Amino acid sequence: MLSINLDDVMQVLTNVRSYLIAFGVVLALAIIVMVAVRKLPKAKKKMIRAQSGLAILLALTIVINLICTGPMSTMLDLVSGSGTINEETSAKATQLVNEITAEGVVLAKDEDNVLPMASGSKLNVFGWSSTNPCYGGTGSGALNTAYPVTDLLTGLHDAGIETNEELSKFYTDYKADRPSVGMVEQDWTLPEPNVNLYTDEMMENAKAFSDTAMVVITRVGGEGADLPTDMASVVDGSWIRRVAQAYGSERGTAYYNGTYDDSLNEGNDWDKGDHFLQLSNREEDLLDLVTSNFDNVILVYNGANAFQMDFLKDYPQIKGVLLCPGTGQSGFEGFGKVVSGEVNPSGRTADTYVSDLTAAPWWNNFGDFKYTNTEDLNSDASFFDPEGATPSFVNYVEGIYV
């Protein structure tokens, strides 16, 4: 579900500002009247003050009703469950999302005409993320599951591509849900099965099903926390302790509130110094397995953050690469149309995909850096900062935000 965002709260206050001002005027006038009659006879003063109090209550009632039936009407309907989005509006929104996705998918590589695949083709889709892809970001960019969601495999099926159901069941049986990455806390665990779980029979069945394989790699990131630059420290818990190490105090934000379950995939998902935007050990093993069994491999990177693609040079079997960020509620319909050739991919990269992210000049400059001499400006605990917040800064360098 959607997370609370301070900008959204401020927007609501802006929308109802005129109503609050009107009530404030009535309240001020009533208070002035109450003060002005203080020298009148007791009975008359009591009557006027009572009427002034009633006027305040009446004004408050009117203002609340005007707000609820005016600028807040749609929001209250949706929150209470009484509001609905009509079929026409929903259909238009779905069509727009599908068009945006279809036009935004980037064809980064296509050799030997591995893409597009004709409708009716069979495809082995590898990678746990194929059954749990990224649909959006975090905070206000999160997905609202109150409405139907089209997943990656459904998008392929609707485009006429038949996928290996044995592989899909293998992934959903392994883990049904994606670990949550949110604004307040982040579980960075990547549930990629250890390759020793792929049986010889499964791989033989896959090769008999199709000579083409797709591997899906996904990363989720967004508002509230930068992606970890040292996954090993997330695994051992020192990532959380960085607040104390860096600022000499436990007081900080939820910025480093990240965990990782390294036991899920039988351990050792990351080596020391590995960052979140590179292949994990399990993903490297998966690529080794797939490329040793298939000569026609399509890699799909599903994520909004530029991934480190230096590994592509090591796998000549990867002949196709598609970049597909979060697609929203139904955008994988558009993705399927790109794979099947119904839509010609026209997307272009908005970011630079470097072979080594750690060599970029901004690598050591982004973060959540705290002032150590601003105790008088610290804020108390809140929803956004459970441990309280300290004023922070960042040294801007070119490319840090793009």
Language-model features, listed with the residues they occupy:
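C-terminal non-catalytic regions of proteins with extracellular/luminal or membrane-system context
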Residues: 1-402
